[in-house]
Amino acid sequence: MLSARVLKNTGFLRKQCPLCKSYFWTLRRDQEYCGDQPCVPYGFIGNPPTKISIDSLTELRERFLRFFERRGHARIKRYPVVARWRDDVYLVGASIYDFQPWVTSGAVPPPANPLVISQPSIRLTDVDKVGRSGRHLTGFEMMAHHAFNYPDKFIYWIDETAEYAYEFFTKELGIPPEEITFKESIWEGGGNAGECFEVLVRGLEVATLVFMHYEVKEGKYVELPLKIVDTGYGLERIYWLIRGTPTIYDAVFGPYLDKARRSLGFPEPPSELMGKASVYFGQMDPEVIGLEKAYDIIAEKIGVDPKWLREVFKPQEALYVLADHSRTVSWMIADGVIPSNSGAGYLARLLLRRILKNLKLVGVETPLVELFDMHLKELKADYPEVWEARNLILELVDIEERKYREILKSAPGVVKKAYEEARRRGRAGFDAEDLVSLYDSFGLPPEIVAETAKSLGVEVKIPDDFYSRLAARHAKREKQPEKTLVEMAKIADLPRTRELFYEDPYMKSFKAKVLRVIDGKYVVLDQTAFYAEGGGQPADIGILKHGGGAAKVVDVQRVGHVIVHVVEGEAPPEGSEVVGEIDWDRRYALMKMHTGTHVLIQSIRRVLGPHIWQAGAQKDIPASRIDVTHFKLPTAEEVAEIERLANSVVQANMPVHVKILPRNEAEAKYGFILYQGGVVPAREIRVVQIGPDEAPYDVQACGGTHLKSTGEIGLIKIQKVERIADGVVRFIFTTGLHALKYVQEIERQVAEAASLAGGNRDNLVDSVRRLLQRAEEAERKAQRYTELYAAEFVKNLKAEPVGKYRLAVVELEDEELAKKVAQIATGRDKELVLLVVGGGRVTVYTGGADVGPIVKALREVGFRGGGSRTFAQGVYSGDVKTLIDAVKRALA
């Protein structure tokens, strides 16, 4: 049983719902049901439970934050919606995500205790219901207060949490106490769990009060060292309750919906009808009865024709989807998400395509950027960071819409080919996995597949939760398997290795004691200056000298708290002293590459925009690479500016500072740009700052070895820029002497090219231009001569009758000449079949005959190839007479 002091002191009664069997607390002796959907209908639509007037989400949010500030809670800024501090999920799904796993595990203290926040959150688990149910959103603000109770420091727990909720809803919002129900439940999310109260008013859940004290490990609950108050008050839901509008969308997005309706020429929906439909929809489980079936049931309940109800609802549904999804996508892009085929970008693209699909189904042709821009103006006050990203958001939306339109053009061909493939496999149509494959491979929404399949006489059943399934598949990050050289059990008793490479990155040699040798090749020292592979920087190599012998160090890896050296040759004995010598030239070159990487990625960000985030990196010699999130290939001018900016930082000889800071302090000071290089799993963070404290050029959490100043880099040279995936651009670059060698090689090639062109470097462009002009003139003459020769060749072409066709066989090595001969000959003679052999190729041209039977006959004698209806080409290594006989058999 879950109870609280305020419930007992104010006379709440504990009851059990006869429908869902949940226990709940209420002041009403006559209350029979739990007060939650679907056990009871909404009772607030058109009938709000409070007289207090709150005119905006902004006002409601501020009331909540101030309420808890007055009660000793520190207000903290909202976190990004992209969870860059986590390695398990892409998006923040609740305010507690901000503090998982570091704070909830006890590894890091919270930024304040207790605290209050209003956190934008994104959940796509119910994306298919958005626009239809009247209450579901993909993006919402979770207003929350949190308290973290330690064994030696108690803040507050169940009694105070329930009391705060009771006071907020009754005193701050003016809701009568008898309208409030506290329903007992269990909450689980983000790897943690605990008992909870769901706070309900007139059938709507407006808050969840979770008392988290479990970690979920392999499906089992394990006690946490902390007891955490994890609350969630739905900003949008509470505002809907207060306004009593037909749907949550009308409350949250009212002004935008009005403008969008006028712009698109949509009629105002009958509010009474929408309200009734929302009430009934809330009581149904669409996952059980089906979304389309739900329309039929609702139509029957309110006494209207189902077809008419759909006609009224569909435009509104498209608008509601537009309003919700456009805000969510704008949040994501403003936080650096680029729509793509993977990661968080996949989820952003899914939402954009769902908008476009719904608008197309109701005949909207208005460019999506216009509808987005209209919404961005409404969001400007509450989310200034979204408005700052306006140009980027609109550009990406435009790109995505153009891609979508191209996808729709390809639909008939793609669907037909997929259907033919399904039939070859003995299947009559498309199943759910086929629809997923068509979406992921070609971007085709299932509704478009179904529409196209109708023309083939195929009926397609679309799962009601199709988009939710897609989102679930892509919601979590894939964990990379850890590289383990030795079993932890073999080194668990050893002390932590002292990391000399951090204490002095310029240390070239050192002395150490051998603590353990495993399998004759894995060596653990008490201290080491050999850098262990990590953060995209390769491990150091070198030598371990011992006694009269030496062993090559070929790899260095972290295994838990110790550093393991992989050696070749005679391993030093345990207990002996060794002298380690690092391959310094290689290490120093890698330090230049690593510091150069930080300089370059910040330069890319400053030129291309703040949406740039590192998507991967590898420091190596003679060249390194950085992969960044970007939606198009940078122009030559942009690349030149990036290179210029990076080298200006090198020339400025900025200091490079390394600081060890508590995680919270580092995040508060620098923000989540710290995690440009990825998640750092530590209580304290090693921060690498380029530039002075008052105006740093770049700041990142990093475990690599770095230079003392940027001047040591010498030179940064970008060698190549390419798109390696949708939404990802790769920069290949080099630094220092390797950069100089690269430039010198380019100079050598330029000089050689100039010499070959008959000039020098100063007039190379003019020389090449003259050569190209001559080459073009020669090409024109060659084409003319080919045409003349082909025409003469055709005059002498001999063909023999075979069936109703005429067969000519010629031997030609020149493929261009063969094409021209075939073009002239088959153009004049529609019954001609021309067989061309030569150059290792066999080609068949026809004036009109179907080449299919000919190809079939040729394959029987060893021909490998294919083509179109009147053309086929391939290879054949057998006797030419056998080839000719096969063609004759096909034509006879």
Swiss-Prot record:
Keywords: Aminoacyl-tRNA synthetase, ATP-binding, Cytoplasm, Ligase, Metal-binding, Nucleotide-binding, Protein biosynthesis, RNA-binding, tRNA-binding, Zinc. CDD domains: AlaRS_core (cd00673). Binds 1 zinc ion per subunit. Disulfide bonds: none annotated. GO terms for cellular component: cytoplasm. GO terms for molecular function: alanine-tRNA ligase activity; aminoacyl-tRNA deacylase activity; ATP binding; tRNA binding; zinc ion binding. Its cofactor is Zn(2+). It catalyses: tRNA(Ala) + L-alanine + ATP = L-alanyl-tRNA(Ala) + AMP + diphosphate. It is found in: Cytoplasm. GO terms for biological process: alanyl-tRNA aminoacylation. Zn(2+) binds at residues 594, 598, 702, 706. Its main location: cytoplasm. Its EC number is 6.1.1.7. InterPro entries: aa-tRNA-synth_II/BPL/LPL, Ala-tRNA-lgiase_IIc, Ala-tRNA-ligase_IIc_anticod-bd, Ala-tRNA-synth_IIc_core, Ala-tRNA-synth_IIc_N, Ala-tRNA_lgiase_arc, Ala-tRNA_ligase, Thr/Ala-tRNA-synth_IIc_edit. SUPFAM superfamilies: Class II aaRS and biotin synthetases, Putative anticodon-binding domain of alanyl-tRNA synthetase (AlaRS), ThrRS/AlaRS common domain, Translation proteins. Catalyzes the attachment of alanine to tRNA(Ala) in a two-step reaction: alanine is first activated by ATP to form Ala-AMP and then transferred to the acceptor end of tRNA(Ala). Also edits incorrectly charged Ser-tRNA(Ala) and Gly-tRNA(Ala) via its editing domain. Consists of three domains; the N-terminal catalytic domain, the editing domain and the C-terminal C-Ala domain. The editing domain removes incorrectly charged amino acids, while the C-Ala domain, along with tRNA(Ala), serves as a bridge to cooperatively bring together the editing and aminoacylation centers thus stimulating deacylation of misacylated tRNAs. HAMAP family: Ala_tRNA_synth_A. Belongs to the class-II aminoacyl-tRNA synthetase family. This is Alanine--tRNA ligase.
